[in-house]
Amino acid sequence: MTNREQFRVALSGAFKNQDGTPVFPMFDLGPLANDQEIDFEYVTGVDGRMSAESLEEFDALVLLLERFDANSIPTSNRLALIARFGVGFDTVDVEACKNKGIAVGITPNGVRRPVAASVLTYILALSGRLMVKDALVRGGPSTFSERAQHMGTG
């Protein structure tokens, strides 16, 4: 390795189950494991929030569930990137990051297919009046007389 310091990446502790197995087995960092210039370490948040102290020696953070707010920003000024594993910035104080020059990114492609499948499912359920029909079935014999009103719809 050169004299240059390693690029250190903190991975949200939420990427691991309690037994240490990965939550997302397909999120494989194996190909980077032998790279001498990159170092990965799992960092667990405290009370659902990343702590500044645990991030002092990192250049980047791959964030899953924990919150990252103004109090999470390390004083070392080394942290340059937060890659939010998911969509939305609801768990990241973007303004605080902007003020400290920390770039924040998301991964929208990761949820496009599941969101599309959910939307299509809702369209089919609503157009077929699934909720009304579900209530009729759950209502038992007392609601059976109403079934005729919904025949041929959906």
Task: Cite the ranges covered by each PLM segment.
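N-terminal glycine-/charge-rich "phosphate-binding" loop or analogous flexible N-terminal tail
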Residues: 1-58
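Short, acidic/turn-prone active-site loops that include or flank metal/cofactor-
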Residues: 15-16, 85-89, 109-112
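Short beta->alpha connector loops
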Residues: 44-47, 64-68, 86-89
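Short acidic/histidine-rich motifs immediately flanking catalytic phosphotransfer sites
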Residues: 55-60, 77-79
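Rossmann-fold NAD(P) dinucleotide-binding segment
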Residues: 67-79
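Rossmann-fold NAD(P)-binding glycine/threonine-rich loop
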Residues: 90-100
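Phosphate-binding beta-alpha-beta segment of Rossmann-like dinucleotide-binding domains, i.e.
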Residues: 100, 108-154
